[in-house]
UniProtKB/Swiss-Prot annotation:
Positions annotated to bind NAD(+): S161, V162, G163, P164, G165, T166, R167, K168, N169, N272
GO process annotations (BP): catabolic process
Any GO MF annotation of the entry: NAD binding
Protein name per its UniProtKB record: Acetaldehyde dehydrogenase
Family matches, as SUPFAM superfamilies: Glyceraldehyde-3-phosphate dehydrogenase-like, C-terminal domain (SSF55347), NAD(P)-binding Rossmann-fold domains (SSF51735)
Species whose genome carries this gene: Verminephrobacter eiseniae (strain EF01-2)
Active-site residue numbers: C130
UniProt keyword annotations, A-Z: Aromatic hydrocarbons catabolism, NAD, Oxidoreductase
Catalysed reactions, as listed in the record: acetaldehyde + NAD(+) + CoA = acetyl-CoA + NADH + H(+)
InterPro entries linked: Acetaldehyde_dehydrogenase, Acetylaldehyde_DH_C, NAD(P)-bd_dom_sf, Semialdehyde_DH_NAD-bd
Enzyme kind, highest EC tier: oxidoreductase
Protein backbone atom coordinates (compact mmCIF):
# COMPACT_ATOMS: atom_id res chain seq x y z
CA UNK A 1 0.00 0.00 0.00
CA UNK A 2 1.38 3.38 -1.00
CA UNK A 3 1.72 5.90 1.83
CA UNK A 4 1.76 9.69 1.78
CA UNK A 5 4.99 11.12 3.16
CA UNK A 6 4.83 13.60 6.04
CA UNK A 7 7.09 15.95 7.95
CA UNK A 8 6.66 17.17 11.53
CA UNK A 9 7.81 20.57 12.74
CA UNK A 10 8.32 20.79 16.50
CA UNK A 11 9.84 17.83 18.37
CA UNK A 12 8.21 18.66 21.73
CA UNK A 13 5.55 16.75 23.66
CA UNK A 14 2.95 17.02 20.89
CA UNK A 15 5.31 16.38 17.97
CA UNK A 16 6.88 13.33 19.61
CA UNK A 17 3.50 11.83 20.54
CA UNK A 18 2.22 12.50 17.01
CA UNK A 19 5.24 10.75 15.51
CA UNK A 20 4.35 7.57 17.42
CA UNK A 21 0.79 7.73 16.07
CA UNK A 22 1.90 8.35 12.47
CA UNK A 23 4.17 5.32 12.56
CA UNK A 24 1.09 3.12 13.01
CA UNK A 25 -0.85 4.79 10.19
CA UNK A 26 -1.84 2.70 7.17
CA UNK A 27 -1.66 5.73 4.82
CA UNK A 28 0.88 8.15 6.33
CA UNK A 29 4.64 7.77 6.53
CA UNK A 30 6.63 10.26 8.66
CA UNK A 31 9.99 10.98 7.01
CA UNK A 32 11.21 14.26 8.59
CA UNK A 33 11.28 15.80 12.06
CA UNK A 34 12.21 19.48 12.22
CA UNK A 35 13.48 21.32 15.30
CA UNK A 36 15.65 24.27 16.28
CA UNK A 37 17.70 22.75 19.12
CA UNK A 38 20.23 20.10 18.06
CA UNK A 39 20.21 18.70 21.63
CA UNK A 40 16.43 18.21 21.74
CA UNK A 41 15.18 14.87 23.05
CA UNK A 42 12.50 14.75 20.34
CA UNK A 43 15.04 15.11 17.51
CA UNK A 44 17.24 12.42 19.07
CA UNK A 45 14.30 10.04 19.35
CA UNK A 46 13.24 10.66 15.75
CA UNK A 47 16.76 10.13 14.51
CA UNK A 48 16.98 6.81 16.39
CA UNK A 49 13.79 5.73 14.61
CA UNK A 50 15.49 6.31 11.27
CA UNK A 51 13.68 9.56 10.52
CA UNK A 52 15.59 12.41 8.87
CA UNK A 53 16.07 15.38 11.19
CA UNK A 54 17.20 18.99 10.98
CA UNK A 55 17.83 21.51 13.76
CA UNK A 56 17.68 24.44 11.33
CA UNK A 57 13.93 24.94 11.53
CA UNK A 58 11.66 24.88 8.49
CA UNK A 59 14.44 26.29 6.30
CA UNK A 60 16.35 23.05 6.91
CA UNK A 61 13.41 21.05 5.54
CA UNK A 62 12.27 23.11 2.52
CA UNK A 63 15.16 22.14 0.14
CA UNK A 64 14.39 18.41 0.67
CA UNK A 65 10.60 18.41 0.49
CA UNK A 66 10.23 17.82 -3.25
CA UNK A 67 12.98 15.18 -3.44
CA UNK A 68 11.52 13.31 -0.46
CA UNK A 69 7.96 13.61 -1.71
CA UNK A 70 6.62 15.34 1.42
CA UNK A 71 2.94 16.23 0.85
CA UNK A 72 1.61 16.77 4.38
CA UNK A 73 3.36 18.78 7.10
CA UNK A 74 2.30 18.98 10.74
CA UNK A 75 3.21 22.12 12.70
CA UNK A 76 3.50 21.49 16.44
CA UNK A 77 5.56 24.59 17.28
CA UNK A 78 3.99 27.86 18.36
CA UNK A 79 1.29 30.20 17.09
CA UNK A 80 3.92 32.92 16.67
CA UNK A 81 5.88 31.15 13.90
CA UNK A 82 3.09 29.16 12.29
CA UNK A 83 2.07 31.64 9.56
CA UNK A 84 5.63 31.85 8.26
CA UNK A 85 6.07 28.05 8.41
CA UNK A 86 2.78 27.52 6.61
CA UNK A 87 3.57 29.94 3.76
CA UNK A 88 6.93 28.23 3.12
CA UNK A 89 5.41 24.74 3.18
CA UNK A 90 2.43 25.66 0.98
CA UNK A 91 4.81 27.23 -1.57
CA UNK A 92 6.33 23.74 -1.94
CA UNK A 93 2.90 22.32 -2.76
CA UNK A 94 2.41 20.54 0.58
CA UNK A 95 -0.58 21.00 2.86
CA UNK A 96 -0.29 22.05 6.49
CA UNK A 97 -2.01 20.55 9.50
CA UNK A 98 -1.72 23.19 12.24
CA UNK A 99 -1.52 21.93 15.82
CA UNK A 100 -0.82 25.42 17.20
CA UNK A 101 -3.55 27.90 18.16
CA UNK A 102 -2.59 30.16 15.21
CA UNK A 103 -5.81 29.23 13.39
CA UNK A 104 -5.07 30.85 10.04
CA UNK A 105 -6.90 27.98 8.33
CA UNK A 106 -10.39 26.63 9.07
CA UNK A 107 -10.97 24.76 12.34
CA UNK A 108 -11.17 20.98 12.21
CA UNK A 109 -12.72 18.84 14.98
CA UNK A 110 -12.97 15.40 13.33
CA UNK A 111 -16.21 13.96 14.75
CA UNK A 112 -18.00 17.26 14.12
CA UNK A 113 -16.77 18.62 10.81
CA UNK A 114 -14.01 16.51 9.25
CA UNK A 115 -16.25 15.40 6.39
CA UNK A 116 -16.97 19.03 5.48
CA UNK A 117 -13.28 19.51 4.69
CA UNK A 118 -13.34 16.76 2.04
CA UNK A 119 -13.04 18.07 -1.50
CA UNK A 120 -12.37 21.65 -0.42
CA UNK A 121 -8.67 21.53 -1.36
CA UNK A 122 -7.64 23.33 1.80
CA UNK A 123 -3.90 23.87 2.14
CA UNK A 124 -4.05 24.64 5.86
CA UNK A 125 -6.42 23.26 8.50
CA UNK A 126 -6.25 24.09 12.20
CA UNK A 127 -6.76 21.49 14.93
CA UNK A 128 -7.92 24.14 17.46
CA UNK A 129 -6.33 23.03 20.80
CA UNK A 130 -6.31 19.94 23.03
CA UNK A 131 -9.07 21.53 25.14
CA UNK A 132 -11.05 22.25 21.99
CA UNK A 133 -10.74 18.70 20.65
CA UNK A 134 -11.90 17.30 24.00
CA UNK A 135 -14.89 19.60 24.54
CA UNK A 136 -16.23 20.93 21.23
CA UNK A 137 -17.78 17.54 20.33
CA UNK A 138 -19.84 17.84 23.54
CA UNK A 139 -20.95 21.42 22.79
CA UNK A 140 -21.94 20.31 19.30
CA UNK A 141 -23.78 17.27 20.70
CA UNK A 142 -26.00 19.71 22.61
CA UNK A 143 -26.31 22.36 19.87
CA UNK A 144 -27.44 19.86 17.24
CA UNK A 145 -30.45 19.12 19.48
CA UNK A 146 -31.34 22.69 20.43
CA UNK A 147 -29.77 26.15 20.23
CA UNK A 148 -26.93 26.90 22.68
CA UNK A 149 -26.81 30.56 23.72
CA UNK A 150 -23.56 30.17 25.68
CA UNK A 151 -20.94 27.43 25.85
CA UNK A 152 -18.13 27.39 28.41
CA UNK A 153 -15.36 24.82 28.55
CA UNK A 154 -12.76 24.25 31.26
CA UNK A 155 -9.76 22.07 30.39
CA UNK A 156 -7.57 20.90 33.28
CA UNK A 157 -4.24 19.41 32.29
CA UNK A 158 -1.15 18.23 34.15
CA UNK A 159 1.69 20.71 34.28
CA UNK A 160 4.13 18.05 33.13
CA UNK A 161 2.26 17.56 29.84
CA UNK A 162 2.34 21.27 28.96
CA UNK A 163 5.55 22.21 27.20
CA UNK A 164 7.11 25.65 26.72
CA UNK A 165 5.33 26.27 23.39
CA UNK A 166 1.87 25.74 24.85
CA UNK A 167 2.73 27.93 27.86
CA UNK A 168 3.73 30.78 25.57
CA UNK A 169 0.45 30.36 23.70
CA UNK A 170 -1.99 30.42 26.65
CA UNK A 171 -3.79 33.55 25.44
CA UNK A 172 -4.04 32.17 21.91
CA UNK A 173 -5.25 28.87 23.39
CA UNK A 174 -8.21 30.50 25.13
CA UNK A 175 -9.08 32.74 22.17
CA UNK A 176 -8.85 30.00 19.56
CA UNK A 177 -10.77 27.48 21.68
CA UNK A 178 -13.54 29.98 22.46
CA UNK A 179 -13.77 30.86 18.75
CA UNK A 180 -14.14 27.19 17.80
CA UNK A 181 -16.73 26.58 20.56
CA UNK A 182 -18.80 29.08 18.58
CA UNK A 183 -17.85 28.25 14.98
CA UNK A 184 -17.66 24.46 15.24
CA UNK A 185 -19.52 23.75 18.47
CA UNK A 186 -22.45 25.93 17.47
CA UNK A 187 -22.68 28.06 20.64
CA UNK A 188 -23.74 31.66 20.04
CA UNK A 189 -21.11 32.78 22.53
CA UNK A 190 -18.13 30.70 23.64
CA UNK A 191 -15.66 30.88 26.49
CA UNK A 192 -12.59 28.74 27.22
CA UNK A 193 -10.57 28.36 30.40
CA UNK A 194 -7.40 26.31 30.81
CA UNK A 195 -6.05 25.17 34.15
CA UNK A 196 -2.52 23.80 34.36
CA UNK A 197 -2.33 21.68 37.50
CA UNK A 198 1.14 21.16 39.03
CA UNK A 199 0.08 18.24 41.27
CA UNK A 200 2.42 15.26 41.50
CA UNK A 201 1.79 12.54 40.54
CA UNK A 202 0.29 14.24 37.47
CA UNK A 203 -3.48 14.23 37.09
CA UNK A 204 -5.35 12.87 34.10
CA UNK A 205 -6.86 15.44 31.70
CA UNK A 206 -10.29 16.58 32.91
CA UNK A 207 -12.76 18.63 30.90
CA UNK A 208 -15.94 20.36 32.00
CA UNK A 209 -18.49 21.63 29.50
CA UNK A 210 -21.38 23.92 30.42
CA UNK A 211 -24.04 24.88 27.87
CA UNK A 212 -26.91 27.30 28.41
CA UNK A 213 -29.64 26.22 26.01
CA UNK A 214 -32.58 28.22 24.74
CA UNK A 215 -35.84 27.01 26.21
CA UNK A 216 -36.27 23.94 28.39
CA UNK A 217 -33.59 21.32 27.67
CA UNK A 218 -34.85 18.22 25.87
CA UNK A 219 -33.15 15.90 28.36
CA UNK A 220 -33.69 12.60 26.54
CA UNK A 221 -32.54 13.89 23.13
CA UNK A 222 -29.51 15.73 24.55
CA UNK A 223 -28.44 12.69 26.60
CA UNK A 224 -28.74 10.43 23.54
CA UNK A 225 -26.82 12.92 21.37
CA UNK A 226 -23.99 13.15 23.93
CA UNK A 227 -23.63 9.36 24.19
CA UNK A 228 -23.61 9.03 20.39
CA UNK A 229 -20.89 11.68 20.12
CA UNK A 230 -18.74 10.06 22.82
CA UNK A 231 -18.74 6.85 20.76
CA UNK A 232 -17.56 8.83 17.71
CA UNK A 233 -14.64 10.38 19.62
CA UNK A 234 -13.72 6.99 21.13
CA UNK A 235 -13.09 5.65 17.62
CA UNK A 236 -9.79 7.55 17.60
CA UNK A 237 -9.27 8.32 21.32
CA UNK A 238 -10.36 5.17 23.22
CA UNK A 239 -9.62 6.84 26.59
CA UNK A 240 -12.30 9.54 26.13
CA UNK A 241 -14.93 8.96 28.78
CA UNK A 242 -17.88 10.49 30.53
CA UNK A 243 -17.31 10.87 34.27
CA UNK A 244 -20.62 12.53 35.10
CA UNK A 245 -23.58 13.95 33.23
CA UNK A 246 -25.22 15.28 31.38
CA UNK A 247 -26.43 17.12 34.48
CA UNK A 248 -29.46 19.35 33.88
CA UNK A 249 -30.04 22.41 36.05
CA UNK A 250 -32.67 24.75 34.64
CA UNK A 251 -31.38 25.74 31.20
CA UNK A 252 -27.85 24.61 31.94
CA UNK A 253 -26.48 21.33 30.65
CA UNK A 254 -23.15 20.21 32.16
CA UNK A 255 -20.90 17.37 31.06
CA UNK A 256 -17.78 16.17 32.90
CA UNK A 257 -15.21 14.29 30.84
CA UNK A 258 -11.89 12.59 31.41
CA UNK A 259 -9.33 11.83 28.72
CA UNK A 260 -6.77 9.08 29.20
CA UNK A 261 -3.94 8.82 26.69
CA UNK A 262 -2.43 5.75 25.08
CA UNK A 263 0.91 6.53 26.72
CA UNK A 264 2.79 6.80 23.40
CA UNK A 265 5.20 9.46 24.66
CA UNK A 266 4.13 10.79 28.04
CA UNK A 267 2.24 8.43 30.38
CA UNK A 268 -1.51 7.89 30.18
CA UNK A 269 -2.39 10.97 32.26
CA UNK A 270 -1.49 13.16 29.26
CA UNK A 271 -4.75 12.58 27.39
CA UNK A 272 -4.47 16.19 26.21
CA UNK A 273 -1.61 15.14 23.91
CA UNK A 274 -3.51 12.15 22.58
CA UNK A 275 -6.73 13.93 21.77
CA UNK A 276 -4.80 16.53 19.78
CA UNK A 277 -2.40 14.18 17.99
CA UNK A 278 -5.01 11.50 17.24
CA UNK A 279 -7.33 14.16 15.79
CA UNK A 280 -4.48 15.55 13.65
CA UNK A 281 -3.52 12.07 12.43
CA UNK A 282 -7.16 11.25 11.64
CA UNK A 283 -7.50 14.50 9.67
CA UNK A 284 -4.28 13.92 7.73
CA UNK A 285 -5.35 10.35 6.95
CA UNK A 286 -8.53 11.62 5.36
CA UNK A 287 -6.60 14.02 3.12
CA UNK A 288 -4.04 11.28 2.37
CA UNK A 289 -6.82 8.92 1.27
CA UNK A 290 -8.11 11.63 -1.10
CA UNK A 291 -4.59 12.11 -2.52
CA UNK A 292 -4.09 8.34 -2.95
CA UNK A 293 -7.42 8.02 -4.77
CA UNK A 294 -6.40 10.84 -7.10
CA UNK A 295 -9.26 13.04 -5.89
CA UNK A 296 -6.96 15.66 -4.38
CA UNK A 297 -3.97 17.08 -6.21
CA UNK A 298 -1.95 19.51 -4.10
CA UNK A 299 -0.45 22.46 -5.92
CA UNK A 300 2.08 25.06 -4.81
CA UNK A 301 0.61 28.25 -3.37
CA UNK A 302 2.52 31.44 -4.11
CA UNK A 303 3.84 32.80 -0.83
Amino acid sequence: MKKIKCALIGPGNIGTDLLAKLQRSPVLEPVWMVGIDPASDGLKRASEMGIKTTAEGVDGLIPHMKADGVQIVFDATSAYVHAENSAKVNAQGAMMIDLTPAAIGPYCVPPVNLKQHVGRREMNVNMVTCGGQATIPMVYAVSRVQPVAYGEIVATVSSRSVGPGTRKNIDEFTRTTAGAVEKVGGARQGKAIIIINPAEPPLIMRDTVHCLVEGKPDEAAITQSIHDMIREVQKYVPGYKLVNGPVFDGQRVSVFMEVEGLGDYLPKYAGNLDIMTAAAARTAEMFAEEILKGELVLEPVAA
